Design a protein with these regions (language model features):
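N-terminal hydrophobic or amphipathic helices/low-complexity stretches enriched
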Residues: 49-112, 344, 579-580
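Soluble metallo-hydrolase cores and metallopeptidase-like ectodomains found primarily
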Residues: 53-58, 140, 151-183, 266-370, ...
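Noncatalytic luminal/extracellular "stalk/propeptide" segments of secretory-pathway proteins
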Residues: 80-196, 200-203, 328, 455
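His/Asp/Glu-rich mid-to-C-terminal helical/loop segments that flank catalytic regions of hydrolases
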Residues: 386, 390, 504-573
Length: 580
């Protein structure tokens, strides 16, 4: 909460939006004057942002942006001959060669492995074999065999072709442990050696990002608490999470990257079964528990922690087809810094180069060109790199540009690089990500995801002011956009990150957020995401200027960015940034 002591000053001294969202307490002062004394961290950051100036050289470089260059990059990267840029295909290789050529022409140095631009990302493909995968419920000596695809689905085990388990089942509410938010379903329950069962989702009282993170961390939390399996199922109101809705996706192969020891990452080998269960089957788990399914649902709807034994056991066998040998590649270019002390620190730009490749035809087309997703982000970052190359004096800190692989497989290229960077991890000070920035209308306002979490907000505000765009609030907080692209891989490593998206203002009667949501509903991840779309190249150029200036100001600052005091993600991950 912000405390404002209200005392007379001109209205334009402080941002109006802060005045409308802060708690004001008026004090009559003996002089009968009123001065505003703002006692909150958010305002301190805003005021400090006003002191950030953009040097003339950087201003001039920003004005040299070329919209036609962005378009040319996009046209090549989304051409049919690249066949959708799926990792491991000739099309992705053509895209990688193109990015390497651009880095070379701009004077960027190779920053990959073995003196080249590339970093190999070893990938493992895993897919559950239906015919060899089973699940049964055991209660009072009676066994009920379940039907795969009707009653349940299993997730692949990335580290074992056959995984078997039989254990009692304990219900743990949402399966969330967040004591920092005053909530812990695991408090007072011992789940060691047991299978936990829980609802999908997280308490609705959590802020949107914390809620999304808590939902995504269920497996990790269960494994940390000693569980040997996890079963999830949806609340009756959560149609999107039901296994019937996700049946096609549940049958697809999935991927993880592997470490030097051949272990798949972001997996938890102690979890011998990871299952999702249909509504009717989930209800049957509570048949002889102390609470019914309906009582547990009501408790969850009240956002109250809960846990209790279900007095039932589950037996499961997961058969997984595991395929190794696929190598993705990140493409990494370096612009060395110029400050003797700061040149060994790095500001990292990322955008994913990969897309979906060739899939089933839609409207007679089977090539997923990925013009907006994400030839647009790569092209904007390439033009931002060109602006850096035109500076008469390069930034104090070094700049890395990374064209990533494996985003469409689950942020794999960024997670691999952030976990295994080609520069010292503790020297990476900030990340800027661009993924589908959405320039189908004039760019009049932006949503800079991540700026609310760290001191990078100052650089964002200064850049936005120069470019002439307003900073808007997140119009779709329920979508948890902050966790849904490659920048979050850096957040997981404790590195502050910014992810800029276009806002809702279009300058006419259209609403940018509605345009975006409609696009996602009709064009996203289809072959129709090609160059036959109404791109606004002036808006794209403004995205370039923003990317360039935010990174430039971060690279020039005396101090590296820091997480805001008490920030959820800074508290959870910030300590990792100091690990080499």
């Amino acid at each position: 909460m912000c405390l404002i002591l209200a005392i007379d000053k001109p209205d334009d001294v402080f941002p109006a939006q802060l005045l409308t969202t802060s708690l004001a307490v008026r004090y009559d002062i003996m002089t009968k004057k009123r001065i505003f004394l703002f006692l909150c961290a958010g305002l301190i950051q805003s005021v400090s942002a006003q002191t950030i100036s953009i040097p003339t050289d950087a201003q001039q470089a920003a004005k040299r942006v070329r919209p036609e260059a962005i378009e040319a990059h996009m046209r090549y990267l989304s051409d049919d001959k690249l066949q959708g840029r799926k990792p491991g295909t000739p099309g992705f290789e053509l895209a990688a060669q193109y990015v390497e050529k651009q880095f070379t022409e701009l004077g960027f140095k190779p920053a990959g492995q073995k003196g080249g631009f590339r970093q190999a990302v070893p990938l493992r493909k895993a897919q559950v074999r239906d015919e060899g995968s089973t699940m049964a419920l055991i209660q009072d000596g009676s066994t009920r065999q379940l039907t795969y695809g009707k009653n349940f689905f299993l997730s692949p085990n990335y580290n074992a072709a056959i995984s078997e388990v039989s254990a009692p089942v304990v219900f743990v509410g949402f399966g969330v442990s967040a004591p920092e938010l005053g909530y812990d379903d695991y408090a007072g329950v011992d789940v060691r050696g047991k299978i936990v069962a829980c609802f999908n989702g997280a308490p609705s009282t959590f802020p949107s990002n914390q809620r999304a993170y808590s939902n995504s961390a269920k497996q990790e939390v269960a494994a940390t608490r000693g569980a040997i399996g996890i079963i999830t199922f949806s609340l009756p109101t959560d149609v999107s999470a039901r296994i019937e809705s996700n049946a096609p996706r549940n049958r697809q192969a999935t991927y993880r990257w592997t470490d030097a020891n051949g272990q798949a990452q972001r997996t938890y080998s102690q979890l011998k079964v990871i299952a999702s269960m249909g509504d009717e089957t989930a209800r049957s788990l509570f048949a002889k528990a102390d609470k019914t399914f309906e009582e547990a649902r009501l408790t969850a709807n009240k956002n109250q922690p809960q846990s209790f034994p279900l007095n039932i056991s589950a037996q499961a066998r997961t058969q997984t087809e595991i395929t190794d040998g696929l190598i993705g590649e990140n493409i990494i270019g370096l612009l060395p810094g110029t400050d003797p002390k700061l040149k060994d620190e790095y500001v990292v730009y990322v955008s994913h180069l990969d897309h979906l490749g060739i899939t089933r035809p839609i409207k007679g087309d089977s090539i997923n060109n990925g013009a907006h997703d994400n030839a647009s982000g790569v092209s904007i970052n390439l033009e931002a790199a060109r602006l850096f190359s035109t500076l008469p004096k390069k930034p104090r800190r070094s700049i890395l540009f990374v064209a990533l692989t494996g985003e469409e497989m689950g942020l794999l290229g960024s997670d691999y690089f952030a976990s295994n960077p080609t520069v010292p991890k503790d020297k990476i000070v900030a990340n800027l990500c661009l993924d589908m920035p959405f320039f189908f209308h004039p760019l009049l306002d932006i949503v800079p995801y991540g700026s609310e979490h760290s001191s990078m907000k100052g650089a964002v505000e200064a850049a936005a002011k120069f470019v002439g765009v307003q900073i808007a609030q997140d119009p779709i907080p329920e979508q948890s956009v902050f966790m849904r692209s490659d920048h979050f891989s850096f957040v997981r490593q404790g590195i502050p990150a910014i992810y800029v998206k276009s806002g809702s203002t279009t300058g006419d009667d259209r609403n940018g957020t509605k345009l975006n949501l409609d696009w996602r509903a009709t064009i996203y991840h289809t072959p129709q995401d090609d160059m036959n779309q109404p791109f606004d190249w002036t808006a794209a150029a403004r995205h370039v200027q923003l990317q360039f200036l935010i990174g430039y100001l971060t690279a020039q600052a005396n101090d590296r960015p820091v997480w805001n005091a008490g920030d959820f993600f800074g508290t959870k991950f910030g300590s990792k940034a100091s690990v080499k």
